[in-house]
A protein has these predicted regions:
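Linear, non-domain "peripheral" regions
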Residues: 1-175
């Protein structure tokens, strides 16, 4: 199936909205320190790149090359990635300790509260952008995307202590899909 310009634009729009929404859901639920403007722009660029890679002929070769470049970049920036991951983990565990007494705050570095979690959030959003672009451009089922997005959403909803009615609405909306 050859994708049209409209499906490419729809893919970029959906992937950008999904990745930005995912990142900001985590940021606002757990008060994660992150540079939000840079993160939003990077999510749009990632959505554009993932959609463009899936349009190319033999896209799996290009995706493999992109994964290898990404792995090299992560290895090169491993200290920054580790600090960003530690900041995210510290922010999430701090919110869970405040909400549920008896848990311990997890800290992987000396001062994780001073860091910026934008890098790890961007790395976490790449598979979601790729899956969303693949779903839109290839005409795949939406169930795979919903199954992938549900764990971070549940993680954020648990900390917000969502009332049971919201869970019922969420489950009923999933049944109709």
């Amino acid at each position: 199936m050859r994708a049209s310009k409209l499906s490419f634009l729809l893919s970029v729009l959906c992937a950008a909205a999904l990745t930005i929404g995912l990142c900001f859901c985590i940021i606002t639920s757990f008060f994660v320190p992150a540079d939000t403007l840079r993160l939003a722009l990077a999510c749009v660029c990632i959505a554009l790149l993932c959609s463009a890679l899936l349009l190319l002929p033999k896209s799996w070769i290009w995706l493999l090359g992109a994964v290898l470049l990404l792995a090299g970049g992560i290895y090169y920036l491993k200290d920054a990635v580790w600090e960003s991951f530690s900041t995210l983990l510290y922010a999430i565990s701090t919110q869970y300790v405040d909400a549920f007494p008896g848990l311990q705050v997890l800290s992987l570095t000396a001062a994780p509260a001073d860091g910026d979690a934008a890098l790890i959030l961007l790395l976490l959003s790449i598979p979601y952008a790729l899956l969303c672009s693949w779903t839109v451009l290839r005409g795949e089922r939406l169930v795979y995307l919903l199954g992938a997005v549900l764990p971070p959403l549940v993680l954020c909803l648990v900390i917000l202590q969502t009332p049971p009615a919201a869970w019922a609405i969420l489950l009923l909306s999933l049944i109709h899909i």
